[in-house]
């Protein structure tokens, strides 16, 4: 089915989603399956960057992911610890894969790495024991370190390092208009969280423990400029706090968490955050 027809079919099905179920057959099921397959191969993306730097969200692909939950029934998934099974609607991306398929895909997935079907993983990516949710896009030479989560439909660029325990938020629950986007050459420090459609622009470095949501103020310490929802390119960002407003009794109010841009990336920063090509051979 051509992409234009695919989009129209999925949009119409989503508008009538109360009528879609595991018993649904025909054009709607075929359209959703085709969309998931295209996402899985990386031939389409939930969000794409234009030449201007703006990101455009393909809402119909997000709708296809959501419709798949109504179309697919629960089933046992083998491979659990001690011979146990899981119980879910979404199969593993790696279901049925053998050595040749992994070699063709060209990325590493160590034991404990979980990737759901419809997520795309680029060549030379390293997946430590981590979780990549459906509809996500992880581009070439990126490292997803241990216990990190890449949420549904999140877009991760090339040569990104996602450190241990990082949380990259998804779009499905709570439902978000746009996915989290981490552009090329970013470094996300351990236990940092980026959620609610925040965009981290190219080359930015988030220190350990930075939490960013749609309403988090990102303060440039040098200029005083405040950014919300977007980290400027090549920024070095650390956790911070803004002084609180006085309370009714005149006492100082509680401080509000924020993020602080302390500098722009320099050679010293690059030496600490550069990727190791040896790990991607």
Curated annotation (Swiss-Prot):
Q: In which pathway does it act?
A: Amino-acid biosynthesis; L-lysine biosynthesis via DAP pathway; LL-2,6-diaminopimelate from (S)-tetrahydrodipicolinate (succinylase route): step 1/3
Report which superkingdom the organism of origin falls in: Bacteria
Residues bound to substrate are: 108, 145
So what does this thing catalyse?
(S)-2,3,4,5-tetrahydrodipicolinate + succinyl-CoA + H2O = (S)-2-succinylamino-6-oxoheptanedioate + CoA
Q: What is its EC number?
A: 2.3.1.117
Q: Which Pfam families match?
A: Hexapep_2, THDPS_N_2
Where does the UniProt annotation locate this protein? Answer: Cytoplasm
Biological process GO annotation list? diaminopimelate biosynthetic process; lysine biosynthetic process via diaminopimelate
State the GO CC annotations.
Answer: cytoplasm
Which family is this protein grouped under?
A: Belongs to the transferase hexapeptide repeat family.
Oligomer and partners: Homotrimer.
Q: What is this protein called?
A: 2,3,4,5-tetrahydropyridine-2,6-dicarboxylate N-succinyltransferase
Instruction: State the organism's lineage.
Output: Bacteria, Pseudomonadati, Pseudomonadota, Alphaproteobacteria, Hyphomicrobiales
């Amino acid at each position: 089915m051509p992409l234009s027809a695919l989009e129209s079919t999925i949009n119409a099905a989503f508008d009538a989603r109360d009528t879609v179920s595991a018993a649904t057959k025909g054009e709607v099921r075929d359209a959703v399956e085709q969309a998931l397959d295209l996402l899985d191969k990386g031939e389409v993306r939930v969000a794409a960057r234009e030449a201007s730097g703006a990101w455009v969200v393909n809402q119909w692909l997000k709708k296809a992911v959501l419709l798949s939950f109504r179309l697919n029934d629960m089933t046992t998934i083998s491979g659990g610890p001690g011979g146990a099974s899981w119980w879910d609607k979404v199969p593993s991306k790696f279901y049925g894969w053998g050595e040749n398929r992994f070699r063709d895909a060209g990325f590493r997935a160590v034991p404990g790495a979980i990737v759901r079907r419809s997520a795309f993983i680029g060549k030379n990516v390293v997946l430590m024991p981590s979780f990549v949710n459906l509809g996500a896009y992880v581009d070439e030479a990126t490292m997803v370190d241990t216990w990190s989560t890449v949420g549904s439909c999140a877009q991760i660029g090339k040569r990104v390092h996602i450190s241990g325990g990082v949380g990259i938020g998804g779009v499905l629950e709570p439902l978000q208009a746009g996915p989290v986007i981490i552009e090329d050459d970013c470094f996300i420090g351990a236990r940092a969280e980026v959620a609610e459609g925040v965009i981290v622009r190219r080359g930015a470095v988030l220190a350990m423990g930075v939490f960013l949501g749609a309403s988090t103020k990102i303060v440039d310490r040098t200029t005083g400029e405040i950014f919300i929802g977007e980290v400027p390119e090549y920024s070095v960002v650390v956790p911070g706090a803004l002084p609180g407003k006085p309370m009714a009794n005149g006492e100082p109010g509680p401080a509000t968490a924020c993020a602080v841009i302390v500098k722009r990336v320099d050679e010293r920063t690059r030496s600490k955050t550069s990727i190791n090509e040896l790990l991607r051979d």
